[in-house]
Amino acid sequence: MPVIEKKRTRDLPQINERIRFPKIRVIDTDGAQLGIMPPQEALQLAEEKELDLVLISDKADPPVCRIMDYGKYKFEQEKKAREARKKQHTADVKEVKMRYKIEEHDYNVRVKQAERFLKDGDKVKATVMFRGREIQHSDLAEDLLKRMATDLEPFGELQQAPKKEGRNMMMLISPKK
């Protein structure tokens, strides 16, 4: 015989007959307080208006319920959750690579690219790569990264100053809030 799992009552929203408190504070559709009463009485008021009795806060003493259209309430809650998810943007780290002997136009392209990343709310890791004996010119690479930091100042702030990491020199710029 298959086992039938009973749905947890905690997962179900507490509306109408599911509200199990001896006394509740009731709020009308227009926000006016109707006072403290037993849930049966409040449910009767809600049914007269062809609406639902929805538990808003069970933490309060007595618990707060509101007379409203539950479908509309659920839709509003889902809409708020969607908006909150949209606003929740995780800042990725985007990398812009170049060599210390970069031409002016190529440099401007990298700056524009970094600017776009910062405007999108992402951090930018600017990296200057060295090959062979080029590593001796780390001072030129540092100057290049500092120049890039000043060019990007309106869009972001320097989070990590230029520093050597193996055969590269890098810095980190985070977007302005």
Curated annotation (Swiss-Prot):
<dbReference type="InterPro" id="IPR019814">
    <property type="entry name" value="Translation_initiation_fac_3_N"/>
</dbReference>
<dbReference type="InterPro" id="IPR019813">
    <property type="entry name" value="Translation_initiation_fac3_CS"/>
</dbReference>
<comment type="subunit">
    <text>Monomer.</text>
</comment>
<dbReference type="InterPro" id="IPR001288">
    <property type="entry name" value="Translation_initiation_fac_3"/>
</dbReference>
<dbReference type="GO" id="GO:0016020">
    <property type="term" value="C:membrane"/>
</dbReference>
<comment type="similarity">
    <text>Belongs to the IF-3 family.</text>
</comment>
<dbReference type="InterPro" id="IPR036788">
    <property type="entry name" value="T_IF-3_C_sf"/>
</dbReference>
<keyword id="KW-0648">Protein biosynthesis</keyword>
<dbReference type="Pfam" id="PF05198">
    <property type="entry name" value="IF3_N"/>
</dbReference>
<dbReference type="GO" id="GO:0043022">
    <property type="term" value="F:ribosome binding"/>
</dbReference>
<dbReference type="GO" id="GO:0005829">
    <property type="term" value="C:cytosol"/>
</dbReference>
<dbReference type="GO" id="GO:0032790">
    <property type="term" value="P:ribosome disassembly"/>
</dbReference>
<protein>
    <recommendedName>
        <fullName>Translation initiation factor IF-3</fullName>
    </recommendedName>
</protein>
<dbReference type="Pfam" id="PF00707">
    <property type="entry name" value="IF3_C"/>
</dbReference>
<keyword id="KW-0396">Initiation factor</keyword>
<dbReference type="GO" id="GO:0003743">
    <property type="term" value="F:translation initiation factor activity"/>
</dbReference>
<keyword id="KW-0963">Cytoplasm</keyword>
<comment type="function">
    <text>IF-3 binds to the 30S ribosomal subunit and shifts the equilibrium between 70S ribosomes and their 50S and 30S subunits in favor of the free subunits, thus enhancing the availability of 30S subunits on which protein synthesis initiation begins.</text>
</comment>
<dbReference type="InterPro" id="IPR036787">
    <property type="entry name" value="T_IF-3_N_sf"/>
</dbReference>
<dbReference type="InterPro" id="IPR019815">
    <property type="entry name" value="Translation_initiation_fac_3_C"/>
</dbReference>
